[in-house]
């Protein structure tokens, strides 16, 4: 079992996110519980390329300071929505014999959606903790509607198990105990 923290970067981890305070608190709690229970925390960063703020070398590219990686925790960089394409993450997870991935981060309707669906297609058991992903309003949907659409309709029971933070922590504790 691993905890993926996807694209929780300085530029986009802001108070404009849907349920921002709850999202930040839940991800912090999950990172702490993962570390306490021997569940590896893995970070993924998105690079939009030259000329964009969300690119290597820019302040907004860095992982959100509230979720800062501990020494030795892995960071994989990507240029597309899926963290599994050309990043080394898939090979790393396979080399460790991982079967279960807990997905948290940003944005629900972009990279989290791709992470969930691609993780499922690669044969992982995908677990999505409630209110541990978020997004912004867009011209077609409010952030709230996007969150509900993906977490309650699209993923749950199809590509992922969308469950409470408490249930995820319980799974982490069981994982530690064997």
Region locations from a protein language model:
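Short coil-to-beta-strand
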Residues: 1-7
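Active-site-adjacent betaalpha module
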Residues: 2, 29-35, 54-178
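Active-site loop/turn elements of alpha/beta-hydrolase fold enzymes
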Residues: 8, 46, 131
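Short acidic, Gly/Ser-rich segments with clustered Asp/Glu that frequently serve as metal-coordination loops
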Residues: 9-15
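Short, glycine/acidic-enriched capping/hinge loops at junctions between secondary-structure elements
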Residues: 15-17, 53-55
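A short alpha/beta connector and helix-capping loop motif
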Residues: 16-47
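Glycine-rich, proline-tolerant flexible connector loops at the mouths of alpha/beta enzymes
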Residues: 48-52
């Amino acid at each position: 079992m691993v905890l993926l923290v996807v694209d929780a970067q300085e530029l986009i981890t802001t108070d404009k996110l849907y349920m921002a305070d709850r999202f930040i608190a839940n991800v912090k709690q999950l990172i702490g519980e993962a570390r306490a229970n021997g569940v590896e925390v893995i970070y993924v960063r998105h690079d939009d390329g030259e000329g964009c703020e969300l690119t290597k070398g820019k302040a907004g590219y860095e992982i959100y300071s509230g979720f800062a990686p501990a020494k030795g925790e892995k960071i994989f960089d990507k240029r597309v929505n899926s963290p599994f394409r050309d990043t080394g993450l898939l090979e790393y997870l396979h080399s460790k014999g991982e079967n279960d991935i807990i997905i948290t981060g940003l944005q629900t309707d972009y990279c989290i959606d791709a992470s969930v669906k691609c993780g499922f297609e690669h044969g992982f058991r995908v677990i999505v903790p409630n209110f541990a992903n978020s997004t912004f309003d867009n011209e077609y949907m409010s952030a709230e509607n996007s969150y509900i659409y993906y977490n309650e309709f699209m993923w749950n029971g199809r590509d992922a198990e969308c469950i409470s933070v408490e249930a995820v922590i319980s799974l982490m504790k069981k994982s530690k105990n064997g």
